[in-house]
């Protein structure tokens, strides 16, 4: 009885519906142009750098601030 409670309720009908939904989305997609890809890459890179810069600033503040306060 415990084993049946742990097994997910997956049927062939639900799997088929999920596959059809994924295929429908894939049919609507297209390969991005080179310009579109480069734009997306630049934006993603800028976001990564921004998050890294914020993290570095927080790190520097948390390591230097106690030294400044202790003086």
Curated annotation (Swiss-Prot):
<dbReference type="Pfam" id="PF00584">
    <property type="entry name" value="SecE"/>
</dbReference>
<dbReference type="GO" id="GO:0008320">
    <property type="term" value="F:protein transmembrane transporter activity"/>
</dbReference>
<comment type="subunit">
    <text>Component of the Sec protein translocase complex. Heterotrimer consisting of SecY (alpha), SecG (beta) and SecE (gamma) subunits. The heterotrimers can form oligomers, although 1 heterotrimer is thought to be able to translocate proteins. Interacts with the ribosome. May interact with SecDF, and other proteins may be involved.</text>
</comment>
<feature type="transmembrane region" description="Helical">
    <location>
        <begin position="43"/>
        <end position="63"/>
    </location>
</feature>
<dbReference type="InterPro" id="IPR023391">
    <property type="entry name" value="Prot_translocase_SecE_dom_sf"/>
</dbReference>
<dbReference type="GO" id="GO:0009306">
    <property type="term" value="P:protein secretion"/>
</dbReference>
<keyword id="KW-1133">Transmembrane helix</keyword>
<protein>
    <recommendedName>
        <fullName>Protein translocase subunit SecE</fullName>
    </recommendedName>
</protein>
<dbReference type="InterPro" id="IPR008158">
    <property type="entry name" value="Translocase_Sec61-g"/>
</dbReference>
<keyword id="KW-0653">Protein transport</keyword>
<keyword id="KW-0813">Transport</keyword>
<keyword id="KW-1003">Cell membrane</keyword>
<dbReference type="GO" id="GO:0006605">
    <property type="term" value="P:protein targeting"/>
</dbReference>
<keyword id="KW-0472">Membrane</keyword>
<keyword id="KW-0812">Transmembrane</keyword>
<dbReference type="GO" id="GO:0005886">
    <property type="term" value="C:plasma membrane"/>
</dbReference>
<keyword id="KW-0811">Translocation</keyword>
<comment type="function">
    <text>Essential subunit of the Sec protein translocation channel SecYEG. Clamps together the 2 halves of SecY. May contact the channel plug during translocation.</text>
</comment>
<comment type="similarity">
    <text>Belongs to the SecE/SEC61-gamma family.</text>
</comment>
<dbReference type="InterPro" id="IPR001901">
    <property type="entry name" value="Translocase_SecE/Sec61-g"/>
</dbReference>
<dbReference type="GO" id="GO:0065002">
    <property type="term" value="P:intracellular protein transmembrane transport"/>
</dbReference>
